[in-house]
Amino acid sequence: MNPDWLLYFSITCFVFAFVAYLFRSEDKYKLNTSNVQFCREVMKWTGPILVTHGVKYFPSITVRYNKKSRKMGVYIPSSNSIVIYLKSHDGNLSDICSTVLHEIKHHIQSKKDPEFRKLLNYNKYGYYNNRIEREARDFENAYVQNCLKDLCKNGIIHKVM
């Protein structure tokens, strides 16, 4: 097999995949309630998931409107609380839902993973490839579409075309 042909084929596949990524259609949603209530509904939606992981209670949730942060959200294990920074999401409900789910996973980890507190040392263990962050991203990606679909069914949000 000619190595040049393989290189050109690989580049072509990459270009097509990149163009498809750029033009993918992402569903857009609009609130039928407040942002605070939306975040609470996402958190309530995770109730059965918390039960299957043996977590008995929800974290508290605070929604910050007033300051844009580098962070989308944060889980604070010492107070079992989640803070969501709305201005960091630019009103994208899919992203807000993903962030709540991501922080819920950290709540589960804080209760069930003995290494959770140690791995919070991002200076030592890094952030992006840190196991707890990878697991939280996998969790949000696994559940975000079903959560949004159920919230549509329940009238909390609706799709816009």
Locations of regions flagged by a protein language model:
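Feature marks short, highly hydrophobic, charge-poor N-terminal signal-anchor/signal peptide-like helices
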Residues: M1-F9
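Auxiliary, metal-adjacent structural segments of Zn-dependent hydrolase domains
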Residues: L22-V83, A142
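Catalytic phosphate/metal-binding cores of nucleic-acid and nucleotide-processing enzymes, i.e., regions
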Residues: T99, R117, Q145
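Short pre-active-site segment immediately N-terminal to the catalytic Zn-binding motif
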Residues: V83-T99
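N-terminal membrane-anchoring alpha-helices
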Residues: Y8-E26
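Post-HEXXH active-site segment of zinc metalloproteases
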Residues: S94, S110-D138
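Active-site recognition of the HExxH zinc-binding catalytic motif
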Residues: S98-K111
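Long, well-structured alpha-helical subdomains associated
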Residues: Y21, N141-M161
